[in-house]
Amino acid sequence: MCIRDRYWMLPNGEWAYSFGKTQNVNRNLGWEEKKEWNLGVDYSLFGNRLYGKFDYFKRTIDNLIYEVAVPQPPYTQNTQWQNIGSMEVKGWEFEVGGDIIRTKDFVWSSNLNLSHNSGKIATLWGNNTYKNGNGFVAPGSPGDAARMEEGSTIGSFYIWKFAGFDDEGNFLLYDKDNNVIPAKDKTENDKRYVGNYTPKLIVGWSHTFTYRNFDLGVNLRSWIDFDVYNTINMYYGIQGQGNFNVLKDAYGKFSHIKGEKQICDYYLEDGTFLKIDAITLGYTLPMKKYTKNLIDRIRIYGTVGNVCTITGYSGMNPEVNITGWDQGTEKFWDTERFYPMVRTYTLGMQFNF
């Protein structure tokens, strides 16, 4: 039995939705258009003992496609994919590498890569004056920590500015006129752009040391000068926030906080880090004379992955998601990404024929 072919009655007497529109059609939706120019120089000197490159790019994306809120009615669903505006991105990348030391028995090779990117929303069209994102989950209603609007820098947090605590341990914030107000009196208009989760500099640095038949490889990586929103401290660092466990710091360095949590720059931290991603030690055995040229050589190696992280960030991992305009937080509610990276140990053999 059905009603308008969209609902079916189940054996228990309940009506179940069978089929219908799940998205609003937009017949005016067009392709995103990308325009980009690059200026680059590649170089190799001293018989390729020193090499590298430098690239600078500027990219404009028009007809940005994004899912925006629409009224019901006339629309059947509350969102629709639309072309909403344009974005500008620019950046550079520099690479240098080569043999630092080269002797008969010993070679030290190194490769250094530096990059920087920045972007902004150039225009928003139609009724899309702004778009909020990076919403925080319950308990409570913390709100959103990002806003996309004309002229906004990609990676900025759109949050309240912390002004201190009152005598009862409640948050004090700055309003739009820089007056200090109790957090309970705040409005959305008092939010401002604070900090940025886009690293000012991304660094990759690899080293390879070879001594006769031994080889040692070390890979390092660093993000420099960027902000991370420590949601763990915000949710679990305050006493009396619900029926769940809290951090030890809730009764230590955060014991003075008694009021409701607030999305403000009190929880922004510098996420700068240096990671040793991997260390590999190997030994190569010549095998031609032992296998009648069947095997040229065998390399035995061991690798330690995720060796260590050096950072001043107090959370679990400063390397948060920085892809998109509403990231930069340790989202503990995203279980697929929240678990810490484990250290790995690998033993292997490589056969060359």
Predicted regions and their residues:
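Membrane-proximal, glycine/serine-rich, low-complexity loop/turn segments characteristic
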Residues: 4-9, 127-130, 153, 161-162, ...
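Flexible glycine-rich, low-complexity coil/linker segments exposed to the extracellular/periplasmic environment
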Residues: 4-24, 137-194, 243-267, 331
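Short clusters of hydrophobic/aromatic residues that line enzyme substrate/ligand-binding pockets
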Residues: 29, 64-65, 84, 121, ...
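Extracellular/periplasmic, surface-exposed regions of secreted and cell-surface proteins
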Residues: 4-145, 212, 268-353
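C-terminal beta-barrel architecture of Gram-negative outer-membrane proteins
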Residues: 215-276, 316
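Exposed, low-structure sequence patches enriched in small/polar residues
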Residues: 113, 126, 156-165, 171-177, ...
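C-terminal extracellular loops and terminal segments
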Residues: 81-86, 130-157, 194-204, 208, ...
